[in-house]
Amino acid sequence: MTGSPVRANRPPGRVAAGPCRVRHVPRKACGRPVPARLLTSSGRTYAPGMDTSRLLRTTGTVIAAAGLLLSGCTSGGLGEPGAAAFSPPESGTAKAQPSPDAAALRPYYKQKLTWRDCGVPGFQCSTMKAPLDYAKPGSGQDVDIAVSRRTATGPGKRLGSLVVNPGGPGGSGIGYLQAYAGIGYPAAVRARYDMVSFDPRGVERSTPVECLKGPAMDKYTQVDQTPDDPAERAELVAAFKEFAAGCEANSGRVLPHVSTVDAARDMDLLRALLGDEKLNYVGASYGTFLGATYADLFPDRVGRLVLDGAMDPTRPALELNRDQTEGFDTAFTAFAKDCAKQPDCPLGKGGPDAVGARLKEFFRKVDAQPVSSGDPDRPLGEALATTGVIAALYDESAWPQLREALSSAMNGDGSGLLSLADSYYEREADGKYANLMFANAAVNCLDQPPAFSGPEAVDTALPSFEKASPVFGAGLAWAALNCTYWPVKATGKARELTAKGAAPIVVVGTTRDPATPYKWAQALAGQLESGTLLTYDGDGHTAYGRGSDCIDAAINRYLLEGKAPEDGKKC
């Protein structure tokens, strides 16, 4: 478990390893044959139906597992920047930033997307330019934003583009589109919409944030996240500092400009270049924060927005991490109850407290004496073991795999938990990492001030984290220390997003979601002036496309007919 900041993160050391395993696997997909792997346009492979980034990674979760303004008064029908100065909503982060020059932004809105073959059947790719700094759009410094689409399949009248974001922050929208959304969303939706996604600035195919190479990342993800003495505490702090220094050395130009507000501005640029007057969007996990930020900045350009697995933007970093810690405990309780009923449960019988105590004892043992994992440079210690467990808690379809991996680890074979952790970190077999963890930290640390001022502040907060989760609390608290040493000062802060004047926005919450607690969905739906809450009473992270006919029907009707479900509807 090694970290990243607060928002939608993953802990260093959590992974998903294939169809019907961790992350975002549609529940029904587990009952039908699927190809073993899909090759996306970056050359990275994904298991079909597996969203490797819909995990909400907050400062603590990423570490722990290891832890625009262009509203225009113009006649341009696509919301091109006009002569009037941008006036952001009062609740938006952008309020304190200089208003961008509309004339300087116009060339960006006038560019054309040139579509080319991606090398992935059915998909096209393109690249758009966006200003590095929206406060200085005429400076000549730009970033590349990679885009992909699959055109509407028909039959039926085309409704425009549907932009999807899998979460993160740091998740590759293009990888998600090509491996899942573009082929796995309901056929009726794909028939009427061009399915579109992009890698946000800082992510993979777009101008990326880079921090550490593979061997250094291997070391980083093994750092003990529950320091037992001053030496281990110093080692953890040093790891955070080394990670931050690597990001500054390799990506210093980009780091100040990868906030969620920047990404929302890029999304409005994309909307215009796609030829859409309104943005139609489905965002999961952290993608709900991106979508809500967009709506708050551009309420008049909101089309049909679905925010699934919602975040509460009013929660400061400390509370986000503590809430998520509580969410993982809720998910673990559900796993523990199920495990105790299974004949192959390696944690024995009894209630969640007894099962949790045995898991905690296992973590203590591998902390003192790591077990073999098949990789001599990465034995399974507490950090990687914890990440592997947390990764599997994102989806109940991964519980059988988790039981098997725990059983093997308790008998001296840590390869199963290591595989889960590697999947969470998006580590390939050749030792290379996707840049998800780098982008995750960069976005989270920019969006909010750090959760803690230093190790002493963690000490103060530990009791509340351990109360939230006796098993995972300490590690997730220490993981949230990551942003304390970030080289760039945060530009955002916790705030209410209201999107005053926007069309109806559907907010989806799952009652036992481990990564985005249900109360966050309730809060966001209440903040958004036009928000309507759709509830799934169940387990797992996010709800759409994961096996609930009730949820899918409500969202499909909204996307296809524009009819939002009744506020408070439960499935």
Language model regions located:
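Catalytic-loop region of hydrolases
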Residues: 3, 7, 44, 51-61, ...
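Conserved strand-to-loop "acid loop" that flanks and positions the catalytic carboxylate
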Residues: 507-512
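Conserved acidic catalytic loop of the alpha/beta-hydrolase fold
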Residues: 264-277
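Histidine-bearing beta->alpha loop at or near hydrolase active sites
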Residues: 537-543
